Amino acid sequence: MKEMPKPNKYLNSRFIARFTMVGLIFCLIISQHMLAQPNTTAGVRRWKVNGTMREAMIYVPLSAKTKPTPVTFLFHGHGGNMQDMFHDHTFEKLWPEAIIVVPQGLMTPGTLVDREGNRSGWQQSLGDQQDRDLHFFDTILGSLEKECVVDKSRIYVTGHSNGAKFVYLLWANRADALAAVAASAAADTQLLAQLKPKPVMQIIGRGDRLVKPAWQLRMVRSFRQLNQCSSPGQPFANLATMYSSAVGSPMVVYVHPGGHVYPATADALVISFFKGIKKE
């Protein structure tokens, strides 16, 4: 009967050494991956507001549980959605220390397009849609204030088109909660009489065929008068001008060569503007 071959101690030791080395490398990769994870939580949150389920994409730095944290709301335009708005603008990368909220609108009749209300959007005036979106804003902010340490002197809102008109509505009806606002591709002269001085940024596309640049420049002139802004302004960034204010409410006007869009080139400017404003 043949003897079984004796195990090769040298080969066994080499196998064990290699196996151990692979294990160590794997553990190192995993630990580095875990260390590289941002100290944040992000995802979709839901609330029931007056019987209707509402949702938003929210980015929350973990430091918000212990440190006063600014909050920025970003509202999509008519027919838009929270996913595209969140991923296209990546405010959380530009301001990782802030809470970023991108709510989802509901089916809403538009003023310039979609009069039937087959696409998502926001209420246009006080009392419209039973003020569902004003209540939604209040609910989100209230829940964040319960769960996080919100810096109430640094709450900001920005939006595009119909979402920017809703920003104007928030300015008119939630002014005491807001430090500053930024509107892209919007105009609503009917709300002007309801506004109090507030730091504001207006983003205008020279090629906007839906909300005419002339309409938006009319808003700019009204905002400058409301905020008692100086003339002429000073450069804020490329294509952007800042106007100082006698009442502490400066204005920035960014005129880009594009059309009816919230351009990615505006993102850093909006965040820079917001970072420089704190409500007294």
Stretches found by the model and what they are:
Residues T20-S31:
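Bacterial N-terminal signal peptides
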Residues Q32-V71, Q83-D84, H89-T90, A98, ...:
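A domain-start/cap signature at the N-terminus of enzymes
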Residues A64-L112, R209-P213:
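Short substrate-entry loop that stabilizes the transition state in hydrolases
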Residues Q104-R132:
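Cap/lid segment of the alpha/beta-hydrolase catalytic domain
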Residues S125-C148:
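Alpha/beta-hydrolase active-site loop
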Residues V150-H160:
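Alpha/beta-hydrolase fold nucleophile elbow
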Residues Q202-I204:
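Short beta-strand/loop motif that positions the catalytic acidic residue
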Residues G207-V211, H260-V261:
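Acidic catalytic loop of the alpha/beta-hydrolase fold
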